[in-house]
Amino acid sequence: MKYLIKAKIEVEGLVDRHDIIGAIFGQTENLFGEEFDLRKLQDRGRIGRVQVDIKHEGTRTIGEVVVPSNLDRVETALVAAMLESVEKVGPYKAQIRVYDIVDVRAQKIKRIVERAKEILRIWSLEKTPDLREVLREISEAVKRAEVIEYGPERLPAGPDVDKSDEIIIVEGRADVINLLRYGYRNVIALEGARGKIPETIIKLAKTKKAIAFVDGDHGGDLILWELLKVADIDYVAKAPPGKEVEELTGKEIARALRNLIPAREYLQILERKFKPKPAVEERPQPPQPQPPAVQPVQPTLQPTVTTVEVVREAKPEKPTVQVEVETFEIPPSVIEEVKKLSGTLEAVLYDSKWNPIERVSVRDVYNVLEKMEPGKVYAVAYDGIVTQRMLDIAAEKQVRLLIANRIGNIEKRPPKVGILTFSDLT
């Protein structure tokens, strides 16, 4: 329907809805010929169902009449005037007055325009041509005006930090300005925090999805190290190695925010980097030398396959230590593909014949494995960390081998899952 005719009705007596509808159709019948009769127009779909909403006040009936119209503007106005020609409902005097004709298409156009603006904004985040150097002087004055001071610490921030369910935490004011330039308005800065994270950031991270976006250098890791210890951060995004957030282009920012790393997983990387390795407490053993819990043997490349031995310590029933050795034959072509995974944040699932089953993002590999039938996946190679959670799902799904970038903190090791790192294959 194109239009909605809205009218008020007053009847000097108590009547029902069907009395009013009958009066409208009866008193307008053939006023302008059979072709413009309301019943005929309704049968042809030119007007919609007449809607009447009434209530009784003392001895009077008042209410509203709504008639949807698919006619043009002139014909719709004529139908509206016909409604006002109704003078009686049953034996009682009545009065109908049209108070509005709503253009349904105008409302629809308004919704379309608003949606188009939203689509353009989202599209611009990733598709904007890299004209930063050309437009820097012009846009700087506009974008600087959007930087606000947030919280008692007066932290530099974008205008949507309060409204958005998600915030992006960066280091300084220059980072905020750069992200605002490309349309990211839910950004807030630590303002060069060292040692003490602002209380405002800690409170925001408790109630919103928080992404920490830092420079791709050692300084960025130091900030993350302090931030992740006190704030409930959900994900980590890093600038490309050697680059700062304030100098990234729109495409580089979008790429970094697509390749998010779970904060808990990145904290394990930082713990290995910044914390001293704890001394390993060993139980008293007979004087015989102890073999390592896991000793990957460097694979020797053969014309067709590579053999990798994974050594595990078996539980001895006697003082003598027994060693269980499992051998994995990895084709050289697979080794080359695994080496290429470094830096991609991707994972490849293989069957027992080393045929690729699926290639997924590292952050999705756990969920993909959860849906797999036990025994279908033989090995998983991924650019990530071997965590306890990953080992547990591998054991549950009968995965025989995990090949990853590095090994995290592991409390309990499943006996039937082998572990190798990328460095073991070089």
UniProtKB/Swiss-Prot annotation:
Pfam families: Toprim. RNA polymerase that catalyzes the synthesis of short RNA molecules used as primers for DNA polymerase during DNA replication. Also part of the exosome, which is a complex involved in RNA degradation. Acts as a poly(A)-binding protein that enhances the interaction between heteromeric, adenine-rich transcripts and the exosome. Mg(2+) 1 binds at E171, D215. One of its GO terms (molecular function) is metal ion binding. It comes from Hyperthermus butylicus (strain DSM 5456 / JCM 9403 / PLM1-5). Mg(2+) 2 binds at D215, D217. CDD domains: TOPRIM_primases. InterPro entries: DnaG_primase, Primase_DnaG_arc, TOPRIM_DnaG/twinkle, TOPRIM_dom. Residues 165-241 form the Toprim domain. It catalyses: ssDNA + n NTP = ssDNA/pppN(pN)n-1 hybrid + (n-1) diphosphate. Binds two Mg(2+) per subunit. Forms a ternary complex with MCM helicase and DNA. Component of the archaeal exosome complex. This is DNA primase DnaG. Residues 278-298 are annotated as: Disordered. GO terms for biological process: DNA replication, synthesis of primer.
